[in-house]
């Protein structure tokens, strides 16, 4: 599938404002903006394996489209939610366990980039990855 491959962060748009809305402190926001995130995505039907490697952690996540699973952000925020495929976009709706607020994430291929959009409390951010 189009998402398969290894993607390295190239640039961010409004990412620090997004992290601020999420309640992440200034020091972690500054570090998070330069995390050197690399995603390795493999899709097999409706199952995905995503490896996240950054300056802060290396984790592997497996999920099935439409099936709720638990996930922790790099800052420790715990979420519960599911990814779905809407056209050519991977769309996730996660609920924070600490306050019940919704975090939406969208992954889509635009040209030769993987664009990951986050929406939380009206703040939208984009992260752009290149193969």
Short names for language-model regions:
Residues 1-131:
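Hydrophobic small-molecule pocket/channel-lining residues, especially in calycin-type beta-barrels
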């Amino acid at each position: 599938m189009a998402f398969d491959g290894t993607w390295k962060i190239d640039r961010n748009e409004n990412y620090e404002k997004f992290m601020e809305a999420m309640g992440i402190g200034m020091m972690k926001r500054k570090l998070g903006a330069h995390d050197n995130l690399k995603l390795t995505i493999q899709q097999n039907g409706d199952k995905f394996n995503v490896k996240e490697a950054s300056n802060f952690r290396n984790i592997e996540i497996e999920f099935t489209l439409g099936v709720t699973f638990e996930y922790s952000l790099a800052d420790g925020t715990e979420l519960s939610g599911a990814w779905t495929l809407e056209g050519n976009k991977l769309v996730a709706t996660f609920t924070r366990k600490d306050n019940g607020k919704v975090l939406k994430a969208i992954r889509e291929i635009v040209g030769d980039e993987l664009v990951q959009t986050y929406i939380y409390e009206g703040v939208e951010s984009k992260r752009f990855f290149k193969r």
